[in-house]
UniProtKB/Swiss-Prot annotation:
EC class (word): lyase
Transmembrane segments: none
Domain of life: Bacteria
Protein name: Imidazole glycerol phosphate synthase subunit HisF
EC nos: 4.3.2.10
Active-site residues from the entry: D11, D130
Location relative to the cell: Cytoplasm
Function according to Swiss-Prot or TrEMBL: IGPS catalyzes the conversion of PRFAR and glutamine to IGP, AICAR and glutamate. The HisF subunit catalyzes the cyclization activity that produces IGP and AICAR from PRFAR using the ammonia provided by the HisH subunit.
A GO term from the CC aspect: cytoplasm
A GO molecular-function annotation: imidazoleglycerol-phosphate synthase activity
Pathway: Amino-acid biosynthesis; L-histidine biosynthesis; L-histidine from 5-phospho-alpha-D-ribose 1-diphosphate: step 5/9
Record carries keyword Ion transport: no
Pfam families, sorted: His_biosynth
Length: 278
């Protein structure tokens, strides 16, 4: 069995690492390069770097921060936020990113993932899925359609009456009538090499990952799934692997504020029978 990965996430606004509840009311958790160095020393398996305001405020990607971070860490670095073109991907990879994470642009144009994976390779294209639970009262017509909603090749990803989870974009601010599980399968088909799956209902709450959501998507695809949103204890990390079948667990605040170290997390998981790199 492949080793399970522990991945800290640096949510960045204005060049500073922040972590809020549901991406709002952000807290300041320090300098991104300092955080990256800390995680490098702690032997985190990877690092995810997300500009949480890039899509919403239409800010350009902070290439210099990526370059400074990539120059001092030796673990794989995934970078997302505000990626709108193939040139943006090229610039990030040239700046030192190993992978790029794409959400809003893929929702606007699903074929962008096909183009990106063809040009740069599936191994560096991560589809970020920010999912929210819905019930029978959800009204898909309350949300503006995308231009591709009439595309027959993509009709299977649209919201249906039995959909349990839909996509959200722009940092969770905008819900979309797109079924999250069907979308994950389509993005794999289009060439995405990995899924960064965030439960927007759990993000920042420290109540644990959404096991039902994560397991449903992990079982629907064959590419790796990173569980995100809700980690508050080491037991939550264990649950992501043991029950939700995730390949990796992402967390921010429990590591940023030094409640637990990466080493503590890995030792805890090892003792519970989860294969990790020590």
């Amino acid at each position: 069995m492949l080793a399970k990965r522990i991945i800290p996430c640096l949510d960045v606004k204005d060049g500073r690492v922040v972590k809020g509840v549901n991406f709002l009311n952000l807290r300041d958790a320090g300098d991104p390069v300092e955080n990256a160095l800390y995680y490098n020393e702690e032997e985190a398996d990877e690092l995810v770097f997300l500009d949480v305001t890039a899509s919403h405020e239409k800010r350009k990607i902070i290439i210099d921060v990526v370059e400074r971070t990539a120059s001092v860490v030796f673990m794989p670095l995934t970078v997302g936020g505000g990626i709108k073109s193939l040139d943006d991907i090229r610039d990030l990879l040239n700046a030192g990113a190993d992978k790029v994470s794409i959400n809003t642009t893929a929702v606007k144009d699903p074929y962008f993932i096909q183009k990106a994976s063809t040009r740069f390779g599936s191994q560096c294209i991560v589809i970020a899925i920010d999912a929210k639970r819905v019930d029978k009262n959800f009204n898909p017509k309350a949300y503006p359609p995308e231009s591709w909603f009439d595309d027959k090749e993509l009709s299977d990803v649209l919201y249906k009456e039995d959909s349990r989870f839909v996509l959200s974009t722009h940092g969770g601010r905008l819900m979309r009538p797109i079924d999250a599980i069907a979308w994950a399968k389509k993005m794999e088909e289009f060439g995405a090499g990995e899924i960064l799956l965030t439960s927007m209902d759990r993000d920042g709450t420290k109540e644990g990952y959404d096991i039902e959501l994560t397991r449903a998507i992990s079982e629907a695809v064959s590419i790796p799934v990173i569980a995100s949103g809700g980690a508050g204890t080491l037991e939550h990390l264990y649950e992501a692997f043991a029950y939700a079948k995730a390949d990796a667990a992402l967390a921010a605040s429990i590591f940023h504020f030094r409640e637990y170290s990466i080493r503590e997390a890995k030792e805890f998981l090892r003792q519970k029978g989860i294969p990790v790199r020590i």
